[in-house]
UniProtKB/Swiss-Prot annotation:
Subunit structure: Heterohexadecamer of 8 large and 8 small subunits.
Keyword match Phosphoprotein: no
GO MF, one annotated term: ribulose-bisphosphate carboxylase activity
HAMAP family: RuBisCO_S_bact
Name of this chain's protein: Ribulose bisphosphate carboxylase small subunit, chloroplastic
Miscellaneous: The basic functional RuBisCO is composed of a large chain homodimer in a 'head-to-tail' conformation. In form I RuBisCO this homodimer is arranged in a barrel-like tetramer with the small subunits forming a tetrameric 'cap' on each end of the 'barrel'.
Species of the source: Lactuca sativa (Garden lettuce)
Job of this protein: RuBisCO catalyzes two reactions: the carboxylation of D-ribulose 1,5-bisphosphate, the primary event in carbon dioxide fixation, as well as the oxidative fragmentation of the pentose substrate. Both reactions occur simultaneously and in competition at the same active site. Although the small subunit is not catalytic it is essential for maximal activity.
Length: 181
């Protein structure tokens, strides 16, 4: 067996005591004496926040007959000119336009499970490839027209994809099947 010299033990003891003094010991939480607590019973309800008495003007979205689909679905159907302006906004922000369509459901639905998953209506079929290099809303509107012609009973949406951040930045429905509000 090897024996350890007394100078080696002294060195170990010295470093141990030095290391122990580097960190201050935990002394517990500070007392609450420095923070006085004043409880005031506030039974005066006249000082509550108010919306200025405009409650009768605020309406919620009616759930019957007017399904909310995506970003601009609370608006009346947009004209081709208004859709072109939205697409121009998308292009100005350097997002890549992409068209998708859905033949059955134009909204998120859960058919096979109650928790969200891949097959719950979020992912639609892509129409052709994303329009990299697109500089004009007329190009996108032409593709929307072709998609409508090919699938007249489909929901069609335009997506703006940011290829730098790798995220979808905007999505809105541009066409719905006839008879769907």
């Amino acid at each position: 067996m090897a024996s350890i010299s007394s100078s080696a033990i002294a060195t170990v003891n010295r470093t141990t005591s030095t290391q122990a003094s580097l960190a201050a010991p935990f002394t517990g939480l500070k007392s609450n004496v420095a923070f006085p607590v004043t409880k005031k019973a506030n039974n005066d309800f006249s000082s509550l926040p108010s919306n200025g008495g405009r409650v009768q003007c605020m309406k919620v979205w009616p759930p019957i007959g007017l399904k909310k689909y995506e970003t601009l679905s609370y608006l009346p159907p947009l004209s081709d000119e208004a859709l072109s302006k939205e697409i121009d906004y998308l292009i100005r922000n350097k997002w890549i336009p992409c068209l998708e369509f859905e033949l059955e459901h134009g909204f998120v639905y859960r058919e096979h499970h109650h928790s969200p998953g891949y097959y719950d209506g979020r992912y639609w079929t892509m129409w052709k490839l994303p329009m990299f290099g697109c500089t004009d809303s007329a190009q996108v509107m032409k593709e929307v027209g072709e998609c409508k012609k090919e699938y007249p009973n489909a929901f069609i949406r335009v997506i703006g994809f940011d290829n730098i951040r790798q995220v979808q930045c905007i999505s809105f429905i541009v066409a719905k099947p006839p008879g769907v509000l």
